[in-house]
Amino acid sequence: MDRIRIVGGNELHGVIPISGAKNAALPLMIASLLTDDTLTLENVPHLADVEQLIRILGNHGADISVNGRRERQGESYARTVHFTSRNIVSTTAPYELVSKMRASFWVIGPLLAREGKARVSLPGGCAIGTRPVDLFIEGLAALGANIEIDGGYVNATAPAGGLIGARYVFPKVSVGATHVLMMAATLANGTTVLGNAAREPEVVDLAKCLNAMGAKISGQGTSTVTIEGVRSLSGARHRVLPDRIETGTYAMAVAMAGGDVILEDTEASLLDTALEAIRRAGAQISETNSGIRIVRNGAGIKPVDIVTDPFPGFPTDLQAQFMGLMTRSSGVSHITETIFENRFMHVQELARLGAKISLSGQTAKVEGVSRLKGAPVMATDLRASVSLVIAGLAAEGETMVSRVYHLDRGFERLEEKLTRCGAHVERVSD
């Protein structure tokens, strides 16, 4: 089993290209099930979750081809992937596939809209709280679907004439449920209005792609999204937007280790709140023609309080990384998680490196320390795993991170990108 070995103490200097966003690529790939034409996606990251979803889509009958080209001397892949779902051969998404990745549950929307039925296993993925599918089920039922849960599967059936446009207000903001209902509503009869919808850039990116396929969606990026149903969707070509979570992660890595790095092929507007928190922590941040420049030379890390919130608030997917940064601050910071319960599993592992963190409900109190010391640590989920890498960059000696398959789900060639900027990070196999 692979592990990541980090020897701390090196500053980061150079250029890091930012990959396409995993959180955008997954719903875009699933949207290919809505049409019998070819959907071509550019800038698709090479990640374990993407490969798993390719297998799932293939199970439904999608024909998938990949044209990869190496960029920057093998540093990363920017792949173009073609999806053609001319015939849906199965409307069942089995447990053995869906259990490995939560987002694969989202196929329920396109399958139900196009084929009138879907049988999808309840999902797996990161062990972050319960993350129930109630909102998906309630929303699809509002569009006229008959839904039953039996034997760990969600069985959904559309009315004889297809799904019916309706008004549905999410009781809480959900990116995944917004994705699913937006996709399902594109082929519904009539108009659907989604209230309290997620405003995340990935939702906007999906709507942009669906509109290119012939959908009629407006209001994306606001809390009210309107979808006028159409009879069918066509193929399209779409470029996946930059990964704002990867952008924020590497920005925090530079703030932690010190140095001067340009993050290429990304946009500051995708994560203004997070960048402002990093700036307040002591890093200098400026926009360049191709991305963002992060500099921290000499100045210490300042304590900053953050509260996670739906976009445009501080992203929950950057909470663990920011906690890693705060372990070396010059004071006390408070980090409050409002999106998911049980998303502090990284606290015990950071403590193994010498961090001083105490929990009270959904708030972590982080007392900055003058030094961290390398130790063996274990990744518990995707974002927690990279927080350990960030901490390891500033720790004295060697940090060995095990269970790095979590990292491979969401970070493309992380060790290579950091190494090219001067970090001592390597993948080792037992």
UniProtKB/Swiss-Prot annotation:
GO molecular function term, any single one: UDP-N-acetylglucosamine 1-carboxyvinyltransferase activity
Top enzyme category: transferase
Keywords, in A-Z order: Cell cycle, Cell division, Cell shape, Cell wall biogenesis/degradation, Cytoplasm, Peptidoglycan synthesis, Pyruvate, Transferase
Entry annotated with the keyword Flavoprotein: no
Pathway: Cell wall biogenesis; peptidoglycan biosynthesis
InterPro entries to which the protein is assigned, alphabetical: Enolpyruvate_Tfrase_dom, Enolpyruvate_Tfrase_sf, MurA_subfamily, RNA3'P_cycl/enolpyr_Trfase_a/b, UDP_GlcNAc_COvinyl_MurA
2-(S-cysteinyl)pyruvic acid O-phosphothioketal: residues carrying this PTM: C126
Gene Ontology CC: one annotated term: cytoplasm
Record localization: Cytoplasm
Disulfide bonds: none
Domain of life, per lineage: Bacteria
Active site: C126
CDD domains attached to this UniProt entry: UdpNAET (cd01555)
Substrates-to-products reaction catalysed: phosphoenolpyruvate + UDP-N-acetyl-alpha-D-glucosamine = UDP-N-acetyl-3-O-(1-carboxyvinyl)-alpha-D-glucosamine + phosphate
Binding site for phosphoenolpyruvate: K22, N23
Database matches in SUPFAM superfamilies: EPT/RTPC-like
Major location category of this protein: cytoplasm
Classification via Pfam families: EPSP_synthase
Record-listed E.C. numbers: 2.5.1.7
Residues that coordinate or bind UDP-N-acetyl-alpha-D-glucosamine: R102, R131, P132, V133, D134, L135, K172, V173, S174, V175, D317, I339
GO biological process: cell division; cell wall organization; peptidoglycan biosynthetic process; regulation of cell shape; UDP-N-acetylgalactosamine biosynthetic process
Family according to the record: Belongs to the EPSP synthase family. MurA subfamily.
Function of the molecule: Cell wall formation. Adds enolpyruvyl to UDP-N-acetylglucosamine.
Protein's name in the database: UDP-N-acetylglucosamine 1-carboxyvinyltransferase
This protein's encoding gene: murA
